[in-house]
């Protein structure tokens, strides 16, 4: 049985249980888990280790306990928006785009050194204008795009699968307003999670070498 690990911040966490590994919360990871269990039954063991509020440095700090020790065969990572959000919301926290890149690089290198056979997907950080970021929207959007560019650069640097999301949400605005997809410009509603799930599955097919 192969192991799949979902890593990230609150978008991945989505209210998951800390006591019951089968309770994935209510986000895209739970939707992916349900789909994979339906289609493949007992082929995969799955863990959700997203932690609400996490930035790239937080994920790096728990790399052993929540990544390496779980020995996943496949892993997806969605991280970066909090490095921007916590810069603007009064916490004066997070790291700049260049530091984000180097911490992310160190994370991937240490994971691959410990688990040389692991296959990794990098999900693109994304945002839309909403109640959580409208006060500083233009600068916020620019900063998220910088992390998105760095996330793509990480995937290219290490030959990983990159899953684009920002353009998908931008295009979705033609169908419905931001609040239809994201609660506050950052956290997905079920419709937003469904979109992430679809893109995750496309990336996973590439990871498996399927068309």
Features from the language model and the residues they span:
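Alpha-helical cap/lid subdomain in secreted, periplasmic
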Residues: 31-42, 61-211
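Serine-esterase "nucleophile elbow" of acetyl-processing enzymes
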Residues: 1-52, 57, 63-71
